[in-house]
């Protein structure tokens, strides 16, 4: 699947496009890309976006320091607070040498701080140029993980309710099954068909971003575009009906959603109190206690024509950027660290086995994450992956 999953994501990245103007700072940095600054003088400060992989990055950083002697500091922003944290950290004298943007919209705010990676070994390891964001000829950022999301489900509970995955081929089927489970929840020993759709900061991104991607994707697809200044809202009624299903066939009263958290949803799913849980491949470590053979994944159906051929949502919102205001030694240390992460046995094993990542680099290891195996099967079966178009959303306030 590496090839299949990466191809699906490439479509999403290409659809979002990039800016066309180049900056003096990024152009000037290309010469320094080949510099051989002494490692002993350099250090790395990574401002990580993904809280669920914080410990994995801490461990990998410690291993790199043990092997090379180069100090690597990893700081992880709180969920939903990355942009605010980045703005604050970049004002400091010891600013991050490595940070992230979520795509073209995020890059627009930070491109003047992005070192040109076009001459770097890291860029040379990419399996496709589609995974790089550019500003003119300068490579400003590089995607480092390809992820997939949908509706994770408990096979045992679905079977106990009298259904199998083949019974759910669209929104109407999903609603029929969920409504039935909700009506029989006491009999089945669950609290609801779906886990709570918590709207606090640890969980709301699943719905205001990932779920909202579906109507945007279908509007872009219908109009043959990759971005727009303003959506028409063609599929907002479809968005509403899947959201309504999430909150009516839920483990909790809709009045409680504002206070429900991501941890609540995980506890409900792992505790076998809900059959369905919207999340992605990155959530495997949270749900693995159910057993690999007990995990399934459905597309997020919203009731559009032809959705029986729809697959899962595949793409990236994680792009590495190297801070061009850092010292030459720190820039080189950061480039060396990234190259080690995506080429060494230690780095690629950690990203595949511990973080559960599919990475778009030549030496990537096949992931043991069963949710990724499921995602690959959808592609192998000819299902159409849904591109990640939410990176074109203008801001958190817009959401």
Segments the model singles out, each with a brief description of its role:
Residues 3-12, 16-19, 23-106, 119, ...:
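Conserved N-terminal structural module of periplasmic/extracytoplasmic solute-binding proteins
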Residues 33, 102-153, 206, 296-298:
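Hinge/lid segment of periplasmic solute-binding proteins
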Residues 62, 66-67, 71, 160-161, ...:
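Extracytoplasmic/periplasmic substrate-recognition and gating elements
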Residues 89, 96-97, 123-158, 192, ...:
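A structural signal for short loop-to-beta-strand junctions that line the ligand-binding cleft
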Residues 116-130, 193-194, 198-201, 216-241, ...:
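Short, solvent-exposed loop/beta-turn-alpha elements that line the ligand-binding surface or hinge
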Residues 140-144, 149, 175-228, 274:
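Extracytoplasmic/periplasmic solute-binding protein
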Residues 143, 314, 356-363, 373-399:
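C-terminal capping/gating helix-and-loop segments adjacent to ligand/active sites or protein-protein/ligand interfaces
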Residues 178-179, 225-259:
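Glycine-centered hinge/linker elements that transmit conformational signals in sensory
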């Amino acid at each position: 699947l590496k090839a299949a999953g990466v191809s699906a994501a490439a479509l999403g990245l290409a659809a979002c496009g990039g800016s066309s103007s180049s900056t003096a700072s990024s152009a000037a940095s290309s010469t320094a890309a080949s510099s051989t600054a002494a490692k002993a003088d350099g250090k790395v400060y990574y401002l990580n976006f993904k809280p669920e992989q914080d410990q994995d990055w801490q461990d990998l950083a410690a291993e790199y320091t043990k092997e090379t002697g180069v100090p690597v500091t990893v700081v992880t922003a709180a969920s939903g607070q990355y942009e605010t944290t980045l703005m604050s950290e970049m004002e400091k004298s010891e600013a991050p040498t490595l940070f992230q943007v979520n795509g073209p919209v995020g890059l627009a705010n930070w491109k003047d701080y992005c070192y040109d990676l076009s001459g770097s070994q890291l860029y040379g390891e990419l399996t496709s140029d589609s995974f790089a964001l550019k500003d003119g000829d300068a490579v400003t950022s590089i995607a480092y993980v390809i992820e997939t999301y949908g509706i994770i489900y408990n096979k045992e509970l679905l079977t106990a309710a009298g259904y199998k995955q083949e019974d759910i081929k669209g929104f109407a089927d999903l609603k029929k099954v969920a409504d039935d489970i909700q009506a029989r929840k006491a009999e089945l020993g669950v609290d609801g068909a779906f886990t709570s759709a918590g709207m606090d900061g640890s969980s709301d991104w699943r719905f205001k971003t990932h779920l909202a991607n579906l109507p945007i994707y279908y509007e872009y697809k219908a109009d043959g575009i990759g971005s727009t200044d303003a959506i028409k809202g063609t599929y907002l009624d479809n968005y509403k009906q899947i959201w309504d299903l999430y909150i009516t066939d839920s483990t909790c009263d809709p009045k409680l959603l504002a206070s429900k958290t991501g941890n609540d949803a995980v506890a409900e799913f792992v505790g076998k109190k809900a059959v369905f849980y919207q999340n992605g491949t990155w959530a495997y470590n949270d749900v693995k206690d159910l057993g690999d053979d007990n995990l399934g994944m459905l597309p997020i159906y919203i009731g559009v024509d032809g959705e029986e051929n729809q697959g899962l949502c595949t793409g990236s919102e994680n792009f590495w950027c190297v801070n061009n205001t850092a010292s030459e030694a720190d820039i080189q240390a950061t480039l060396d660290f990234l190259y080690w992460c995506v080429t060494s046995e230690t780095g690629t094993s950690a990203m595949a086995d511990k973080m559960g990542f599919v990475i778009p680099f030549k030496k990537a290891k096949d992931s043991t994450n069963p949710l990724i195996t499921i995602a690959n099967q959808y592609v192998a079966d000819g299902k159409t992956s849904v591109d990640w178009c939410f990176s074109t959303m203008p801001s958190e306030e817009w959401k």
